[in-house]
Amino acid sequence: MTAGGQAEAEGAGGEPGAARLPSRVARLLSALFYGTCSFLIVLVNKALLTTYGFPSPIFLGIGQMAATIMILYVSKLNKIIHFPDFDKKIPVKLFPLPLLYVGNHISGLSSTSKLSLPMFTVLRKFTIPLTLLLETIILGKQYSLNIILSVFAIILGAFIAAGSDLAFNLEGYIFVFLNDIFTAANGVYTKQKMDPKELGKYGVLFYNACFMIIPTLIISVSTGDLQQATEFNQWKNVVFILQFLLSCFLGFLLMYSTVLCSYYNSALTTAVVGAIKNVSVAYIGILIGGDYIFSLLNFVGLNICMAGGLRYSFLTLSSQLKPKPVGEENICLDLKS
């Protein structure tokens, strides 16, 4: 039983504080898990695509999908996890998630290879307002003025930083903005589709990867991406192979942690956790990335972004940790029953 499920079960006969605690812990831990996985995979992918010069981001994405399929399938066979067997209704239940999933995967890997780490992390923050907009339209959510102002601070900082980017790369900018759109849509639709009575967390992950690995392989072959991967001259380098396998495993962990964070939190909170993770990634990129060209305006914009993201996190966590009136909580539990 999940932490959220335990909370509901305890709420029927226990005290309100006890009912809230597991859900609160699950929210915080799932957000921390997602932030850690997101942080690690950006560093590993950056090393593969930039330091080693690996020319095939689509092939790397295929490796991450294959790792996801194998890990989940073996876990199901060993009865560690459960998700429904395939039937003809599953593609209809999932749509449009597989398309958003592969678009998010390919655009993310492509943009990582074409931009410096600090600029990549700044431009990825446009995922946040897009997620806010889509949650309002698709899920009918409403947010306070303080949260909206925090989001606008993130956007303002991103504009300032991007406007003074001394290593402007149009192709990289296009890929990262596509990645923002796909990430926002993927997060919102994942939240919508993740019904435990239907596919559940693991079913969404497994069937997404299954449906899109063959089309992605076809794209890789048709664009020459696969040929470049097979001709790459580092396949005898043990360190490179270990980093490639690590990236594949982290790709699975990132997908799982994203779904888990969206399950316990809102899609917007998941997007902002990714932005907070960028605090570490951006400053590490400035210090050791080797591809950041310093500009005062760029640096100021970067810090405005980070401040807005941290303020959003503070507001969101404060609202989650604030105890609800007992009467209101009982009403919520009655409705769930």
UniProtKB/Swiss-Prot annotation:
Function: Nucleotide sugar antiporter transporting UDP-N-acetylglucosamine (UDP-GlcNAc) and UDP-glucose (UDP-Glc) from the cytosol into the lumen of the Golgi in exchange of UMP. By supplying UDP-N-acetylglucosamine, a donor substrate to heparan sulfate synthases, probably takes part in the synthesis of these glycoconjugates.
Chain ranges passing through the membrane: 28-48, 54-74, 147-167, 168-188, 202-222, 238-258, 266-288, 293-315
Lineage of source species: Eukaryota, Metazoa, Chordata, Craniata, Vertebrata
Catalytic activity: UMP(out) + UDP-N-acetyl-alpha-D-glucosamine(in) = UMP(in) + UDP-N-acetyl-alpha-D-glucosamine(out); UMP(out) + UDP-alpha-D-glucose(in) = UMP(in) + UDP-alpha-D-glucose(out)
Segments on the Cytoplasmic face: 1-27, 75-146, 189-201, 259-265, 316-337
Keyword tags: Antiport, Golgi apparatus, Membrane, Sugar transport, Transmembrane, Transmembrane helix, Transport
Family membership noted in the UniProt record: Belongs to the TPT transporter family. SLC35D subfamily.
Record protein name field: Nucleotide sugar transporter SLC35D2
This protein's GO CC annotations: Golgi apparatus; Golgi membrane
Tissue: Highly expressed in heart, kidney, small intestine, placenta, lung and peripheral blood leukocyte. Weakly expressed in skeletal muscle and spleen. Not expressed in brain, colon and thymus.
Keyword Transferase: no
GO biological process: heparan sulfate proteoglycan biosynthetic process; keratan sulfate proteoglycan biosynthetic process; nucleotide-sugar transmembrane transport
Gene: SLC35D2
Domain of life: Eukaryota
Bilayer topology term: Multi-pass membrane protein
InterPro entries the record matches: Sugar_P_trans_dom, TPT_transporter
GO MF term set: antiporter activity; nucleotide-sugar transmembrane transporter activity; UDP-glucuronate transmembrane transporter activity; UDP-N-acetylgalactosamine transmembrane transporter activity; UDP-N-acetylglucosamine transmembrane transporter activity
Subcellular location: Golgi apparatus membrane
Extracellular topological domain: 49-53, 223-237, 289-292
Keyword Nucleotide-binding: no
